[in-house]
A protein has these predicted regions:
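Hydrophobic faces of well-ordered beta-strands that scaffold small-molecule active sites
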Residues: 6-13, 42-46, 78-85, 115-116, ...
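Core active-site phosphate/anionic-ligand binding loop and the adjoining beta-turn-alpha structural block
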Residues: 216, 241, 249-252, 256-320, ...
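Terminal or standalone catalytic/regulatory effector modules within metabolic enzymes
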Residues: 36-54, 289-297, 301-527
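Glycine-rich phosphate-binding active-site loops on the catalytic face of alpha/beta enzymes
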Residues: 177, 224-241
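Conserved, mostly hydrophobic/aromatic
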Residues: 14, 117, 173, 225, ...
Length: 613
């Protein structure tokens, strides 16, 4: 019998790489026994990035979910692991150091054994801090290398990165091939180097199957000494997900490895339950395109799980772009035309912003920047005229050190806008904030929760936690789901239907129109009405892109109000689109005389947001 290789079921990532939401706690505790009964998993990925936040988004408590979900695996002797984003914790933006420390204490108390900590820039300073905090909390620290392919990201680069992570105290190494574009032979060379130098370090390989390399990569890393392989299972294996455990087991068994048997009766029961969860609500948020493999991803390097959101972004902006082309007497683009242009623009943008590995959140940043550039170019404007604050933070080094050099044109633009590059430790920019959140919880009469887990959720996901506590998150989700179900039902009469949504005992009336893409979301609390229209000459502040309008990015910032004096170029609001806040600048100096939209309102490109006189 050959060397033993173990399997980890990445049940959390199966859902994240396919769609938007995660199963509810009642569903998770139903499927856990069948996953255990399959008898082939040494580990299960239970939570982390894309789990806790998603629970809040549909109005559920993630703390209860994690505790109940990890419990049966502990009882069965199966290790649990989570994904964390190092400096960014469980979100898309940097986290204060005291919140990061509390993060690991809470997750250990909730039953999570291993943290897979990665920095989307592969900045070892961010990862080594996570290693330290995780080990202080009693967790196994699995340091992660985000894999991609560029002139910077060579075999030598990753071997040196592994040396730094081991020296920094890593218990294990994860090879995170999030886009599935790692070349199999090169990955084998990296694993071989690590194992020859650090034979006692556990190596776990995570590869997503979007472009099609993954089975070959699994075989190469296994031959080179990899210990654990991440796998998926039907009906969410393959596509933008992961190789199915059945195939991986048979391939490795044929190669002479010692691999566990699979209880196929339990597999089929788990498969049936997962399909049931999809039919219940999760499937409404899984784009059909995410169920297919496409080697088009090899060239642009974007993770396959982004194809659904990318196609949605392209479709959303296609009409606007074609309007601009029509005004210029140019033929309209098809979605495929726009996708090819988009991939070309990603290839232009990526090296110029320093080759960040294309993983959350930096894959979104590169994709968004490419799309913004494309939209501006089609309107006869210049590149780089729409760069969100989050993207600037990445470019300037506030999230960590970029692997490559930033292009001179962006350095010049930063200087012109008075932006400074940061070369210090990025954590220094984000001081402790737990005391602020404690004050907020005290003021609201909210409990800190077992092991301070409720305090942690507010600190990690402030806006989402507040919406969860108010009931608004649940109401908005229920309304959105009702609209999706109604649209799919394709009722013949096409008459609007009134629904009543019950949220924590409070009833909300929802009107669903079958010819509309979505129903109006019920409001948990009445919002202030926009100001009355003004007469006379005024300059319109126009939405530069479709999305949600917000007066500020967070509750600690002061919103622009009627009567305020602003200067041309001042930030007067934000449009949340494609997972980032895009600043809206005042087009002229003067007094704000009308605010036409409420925070949280959906807006279309070119909608008037406010007026300046």
């Amino acid at each position: 019998m050959g060397r033993e290789i173990k399997f980890s079921l990445v049940y959390r990532d199966m859902w994240q790489s396919s769609g938007k939401y995660q199963p509810r706690v009642d569903q998770l505790v139903r499927i856990a026994p069948e996953i255990i009964n399959m008898g082939c998993f040494a580990r299960v990925e239970t939570n982390g990035g894309g789990f806790e936040q998603v629970n809040l988004l549909y109005g559920e408590n993630p703390n209860k979910s994690v505790r109940a979900w990890t419990k049966p695996f502990h009882e069965a002797g199966i290790q649990t692991h989570m994904l964390d984003r190092a400096l960014n914790g469980l979100r898309m933006s940097p986290v204060p150091v005291d919140v990061r420390k509390l993060f690991y204490k809470v997750k250990k108390a909730q039953g999570v054994d291993i943290t897979r900590c990665f920095c989307g820039l592969n900045d070892t300073r961010n990862i080594i801090d996570s290693i330290k905090y995780a080990k202080e909390a009693g967790m196994i620290a699995q340091a992660t290398m985000c894999l991609t392919v560029s002139k910077v990201h060579t075999v030598e680069y990753y071997c040196n990165l592994a040396d730094e992570l081991v020296a920094g105290g890593a218990d294990e190494i994860c090879m995170k091939d999030m886009a599935g574009i790692g070349r199999p032979v090169s990955l084998g060379k990296i694993v071989s180097y690590i194992k020859s130098k650090y034979p006692n370090i556990t190596i776990q390989y995570h590869g997503q199957t979007g472009p099609g390399f993954t089975p070959a990569s699994i075989l190469e890393v296994a031959k080179a000494g990899c210990d654990i392989i991440d796998v998926g299972m039907e009906p969410l294996s393959w596509g933008t997900g992961h190789a199915d455990v059945i195939m991986v087991r048979e391939m490795l068994k044929d190669a002479g490895f010692d691999v566990p048997e699979i209880n196929m009766a339990a597999y089929m029961r788990a498969r049936t339950l997962t399909q049931e969860f999809m039919d219940d609500f999760l499937g409404y948020y899984i784009p059909e395109s995410n169920r297919r493999l496409t080697s088009l991803l090899i060239g642009c390097g974007l993770p396959g799980g982004m194809m659904g959101s990318l196609m949605n972004d392209l479709t959303t902006n296609l009409e606007s772009i074609n309007k601009s082309r029509a005004k210029q007497g140019k033929p309209a683009y098809t979605t495929d035309d726009l996708m090819v242009k988009m991939f070309d623009e990603v290839a232009y943008v990526w090296p110029r912003v320093g080759f960040p590995p294309l993983v959350t959140p930096f894959s979104q940043y590169v994709k968004n920047l490419a799309l913004f550039n494309l939209m501006q170019l089609e309107k006869g404007k210049e590149r780089w005229t729409m760069i969100a604050d989050n993207i600037w933070d990445m470019i300037l080094g506030k999230s960590g050190k970029l692997p490559g050099e930033v292009a001179p044109e962006l350095k010049e633009l930063a200087a012109k806008q008075g932006r400074e590059f940061f070369t210090g430790n990025p954590q220094d920019l984000y001081p402790d904030k737990l005391d602020e959140f404690r004050k907020e919880m005290d003021a609201n009469g909210w409990e800190y929760g077992q092991d301070d887990e409720e305090l942690f959720e507010l600190a990690m996901h402030p806006e989402q936690y507040r919406a969860y506590k108010s009931g608004k998150a649940k109401a908005d989700f229920e309304a959105d789901l009702a609209a999706k179900k109604a649209a799919k039902a394709n009722v013949g009469s096409l008459k609007p239907q009134s629904l009543t949504v019950d949220v924590n005992g409070e009833k909300y009336a929802v009107t669903v129109s079958y010819d509309a893409p979505k129903a109006d979301a019920p409001k948990a609390a009445a919002a202030a009405a926009p100001s009355a229209p003004v007469s006379g000459n005024a300059t319109d502040v126009i939405a530069p892109i479709s999305g949600k309008f917000f007066k500020t990015k967070d509750s600690s910032s002061k919103a622009v109000a009627i009567g305020d004096m602003v200067k041309e170029g001042d930030i007067v609001g934000y449009i949340e689109a494609m997972k980032v806040f895009n600043a809206v600048a005042a087009p002229a100096s003067g007094k704000v005389v009308e605010i036409c939209r409420n925070s949280g309102d959906d807006v279309d490109e070119d909608d008037v947001l406010m007026k300046i006189q």
